[in-house]
Regions:
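Glycine-aromatic-enriched surface loops/turns that form tight recognition elements
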Residues: 3, 19-105, 109-189
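Bacterial N-terminal signal peptides that target proteins for export
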Residues: 1-7
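Extended rod-forming repeat segments used as scaffolds/tethers
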Residues: 9-11, 54
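Hydrophobic h-region of N-terminal signal peptides that target proteins for export
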Residues: 11-19
Length: 189
């Protein structure tokens, strides 16, 4: 009977983690609170701290008015740059002028870093603003890592920076070695 109660208690404690909710330290001040973002109601938000406008969903996902549906597409770095260029220039692309914005691009690593919610991990992004941030490979990635691609190149053009949204850490990868997910940004109009 004690084993039964222990198992039930553990299930009750761990159940919130199974749904993909971020793990947050409630004693820390929020670094990316929802109030900082202006929701345009069209799948985009403007960060009032930086003036940057962001797509709420990663490429491959679709905004349905309240969340991101589908699975994000992972791109190799050059592909990520090319798809961003197509979105800007190809009027037949589904995301051309998405949310009324015409200059979508890959963010640099400093821009991505402004999105990190330092009080949380799994994900380290504000899930109210960027829903299903941990989506990938047909599931919510609870034990893996999710990386966002940046346009920042380092080490004599052989590596590019990425943001690990699982932890909020920044890292570098050899260009062309691994595909990453893409969240597009635009400058203040």
């Amino acid at each position: 009977m004690n084993l039964y109660r222990f198992s039930f208690a553990m299930l009750a404690l761990l159940a919130p983690l199974a749904h993909g909710a971020a793990i947050c330290d409630d004693t820390m001040d929020r670094t990316a609170p929802s109030a900082r973002f202006l929701d345009h109601g069209n799948g985009t938000v403007t960060d009032q701290h930086t003036g940057l406008t962001w797509m709420r969903c990663k490429l491959g996902q679709t905004w349905n008015g309240s969340s991101c549906l589908g699975e994000p597409t992972a791109y190799y770095w050059q592909q990520g740059l090319q798809v961003a260029e197509r979105i800007r220039s190809d009027s037949s692309h589904a995301l051309y002028h998405f949310g009324g914005v015409s200059q979508w691009r890959l963010p640099d690593i400093k821009e991505l870093a402004t999105l990190v919610e330092h009080a949380c991990y799994k994900p380290s992004l504000n899930e109210a603003i960027f829903p299903r941030a941990m989506a990938g490979d047909g599931k919510e990635v609870n034990d893996g890592y999710v990386y966002l691609m940046s346009s920042t190149v380092a080490s004599a053009n052989s590596q590019r920076a990425y943001l690990d949204i699982t932890s909020g850490d920044i890292g570098f990868r050899v260009i062309g070695a691994y595909p990453d997910q893409v969240l597009l940004v635009a400058n203040k109009p």
